[in-house]
Amino acid sequence: MDKIQKIMARWNAILPLSERDRELLSRRFTIDFNYNSNHIEGNTLTYGQTEILLLFGKIVGEAEAKDVQEMTASNVGLKMMKEEAQLKDIPLTQHFIRTLHKTLLREDYKVFRNLPGGQTTSYTIHAGIYKTRPNSVITRYGDRFEYASPEETPALMGDLVEWYNEAEKSGKFTPVELAAMFHYRYIRIHPFEDGNGRIARLMANYILSRHDYPMIVVRSRKKNEYLEALHKTDLTVGAAPSIGAHASKREIQQFLTYFSNLFVEEVSYNISFLTERGENVWWFDGERVKFRSATTSQMLNLMYSKPDITIPCLSENIGINIASVNKQIKQLTTKGYIQRASNGNWRLIITPSI
């Protein structure tokens, strides 16, 4: 039994989930996925801002309007993807991918760039339409990597969707292999002028969900691991976009290994999140949080059960002086674990397990 089979056996052992556990996991995934997928691409909303925006529709603190709109649209796209994944008798289409992209970008917009000599140029990013100009990326090693040309993109996307539908029917690949191969091939095409990374991560989860596998989050704090896995695979596959867009399972082995390990890690987190219980067990952005001081958990539990509790009352209940309470509050706030609402109530961003 390989590692994917082992982790799926552990996952299946805790099924069916209670309604409460399904809701808890769905809420955590919604925040984690949207925050991380957009943060990888430069969105500046904090984890706490993302949670409050998506759960309550409110903005806390300073935030760029573009980032707020982007995060809101991302959540709409996530919901759309999950609904489409349940239509298992309907094959994947290019139309769905383009519609998903239009949902993420919302509308066409112009990008302005300064040229040497003080001149300015601009071009239009099209929502839901394949690229009309070449795109490339400067890798972390300083070299330019070209994606498929606008002329070859429609045919390559047609090949990708056709391959996926046939591969799914054949049963030749596991859902994890399908998701990894689709992600890599899609990235090598880079069919749109913007939003390709976000679409790739949504589509990988579309494939997993379509086969009743847990969905995953590429954590922004591990962005370098993600990009390095893609880069190393590019070196193996070769620079030609048309070759990358048809890469075999053997050729993308390095990215498949990364993706498989990510899947195991994320499902392990889900299992722990749902099964570990206790007043000292806390969760934040895909990690189990342990505190050195027992008073920190006591403070968080009091804030959770009594959001309007005052600092003097926290001091009295925990048995430490007010200066120590304020010091811990500052540390928790800095890490993004807690916020204080405008009415003075405490809002926990970190998640309790009780």
Segment roles from a protein language model:
Residues M1-I354:
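FIC/Doc superfamily catalytic core
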